[in-house]
């Protein structure tokens, strides 16, 4: 029997609600002096637990504290992402082999033309398509990613391109989870792991950041700018404006003004009001600036 659209939505909602769980307060490692939004809640705690304990690794993506930071793409946004693939001339099914929605028990939805999928996986694939649209092939690139989640974006890039190296830049706890995730999907060979304290100034072919750079305080942004951003031939930075005033975070316009060849594009699909994409070193275009 073919289920109607409304019933499928209800079933997805119930399944996802069943997956959702909360981290016990006794396990919290939340920082009292955060330098980024990801340090405000229990995000670092669940990263650490998932990197060390099979029980938590199997379900970390459905933890409420983790979803508040990373796993927040819903079914409606999933369909908008599929439409974005088509606007760029690709069928979303070409990227299905890159998805690992079976790891970490993420929320999943029935998305037209994509199937039963984690929309977060769709977003990572859409970003790969955008990268290849404006920069061409990523083969032989040395890539650095600022703020790496569980390694989902980097994992898909490593699986789809023959890069020279892929540097994951983040705090110790997320990096521990990334190592475990990449081991699970067999993509550790070209991965490099760097904490902010160990960051070295040096040339990169491409730097990317999905929101994370824009969620840092200004002091940390300046460090990243000096050591990574200014040293990168190309850049792809998705930017939001949600940090509290005390962070004194650069706006996207200020950030772009410090990179002579940069351009600002609309984020497509728009995940939050005011979000934009800042790029430089590109030869292709994604549409309207």
Residue ranges and their predicted role:
Residues 121-139:
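Conserved alpha-helix/loop element of class I SAM-dependent methyltransferases that forms part
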Residues 150-162:
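Conserved SAM-binding loop of SAM-dependent methyltransferases across substrates and taxa
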Residues 232-243:
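Conserved beta-strand signature within the Rossmann-like core of class I S-adenosyl-L-methionine
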Residues 205-219:
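A short SAM/SAH-binding and catalytic strip from SAM-dependent methyltransferases
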Residues 139-149:
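Conserved class I S-adenosyl-L-methionine
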Residues 2-118:
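N-terminal accessory regions of S-adenosyl-L-methionine
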Residues 180-202:
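S-adenosyl-L-methionine
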Residues 216-228:
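A short, conserved alpha-helix within the catalytic core of class I
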């Amino acid at each position: 029997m073919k289920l109607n659209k409304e019933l499928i939505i209800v079933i997805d909602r119930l399944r996802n609600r069943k997956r959702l769980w909360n981290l016990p307060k006794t396990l919290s490692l939340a920082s009292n002096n955060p330098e980024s939004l990801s340090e405000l809640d229990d995000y670092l705690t669940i990263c650490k637990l998932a990197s060390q304990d099979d029980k938590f690794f199997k379900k970390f993506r459905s933890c409420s504290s983790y979803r508040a930071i990373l796993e927040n793409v819903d079914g409606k946004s999933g369909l908008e992402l599929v439409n974005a693939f088509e606007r760029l001339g690709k069928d979303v099914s070409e990227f299905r082999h890159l998805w690992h929605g079976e790891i970490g028990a993420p929320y999943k939805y029935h998305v037209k033309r994509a199937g039963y999928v984690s929309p977060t996986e769709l977003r990572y694939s859409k970003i790969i398509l955008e990268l290849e649209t404006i920069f061409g092939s990523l083969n032989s690139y040395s890539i650095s990613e600022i703020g790496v989640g569980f390694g989902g974006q980097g994992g898909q890039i490593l699986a789809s391109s023959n890069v020279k190296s892929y540097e994951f830049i983040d705090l110790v706890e997320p990096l521990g989870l990334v190592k475990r995730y990449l081991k699970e999907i067999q993509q550790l060979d070209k991965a490099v792991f760097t904490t902010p304290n160990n960051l070295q100034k040096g040339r990169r072919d491409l730097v990317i950041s999905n929101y994370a750079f824009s969620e840092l305080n200004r002091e940390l942004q300046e460090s990243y700018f000096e050591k990574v951003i200014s040293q990168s031939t190309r850049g792809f930075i998705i930017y939001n404006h949600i940090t509290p005033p005390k962070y004194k975070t650069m706006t996207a316009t200020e950030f772009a003004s410090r990179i002579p060849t940069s351009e600002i594009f609309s984020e497509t699909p728009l995940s939050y009001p005011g979000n934009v994409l800042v790029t430089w070193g590109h030869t292709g275009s994604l549409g309207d600036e």
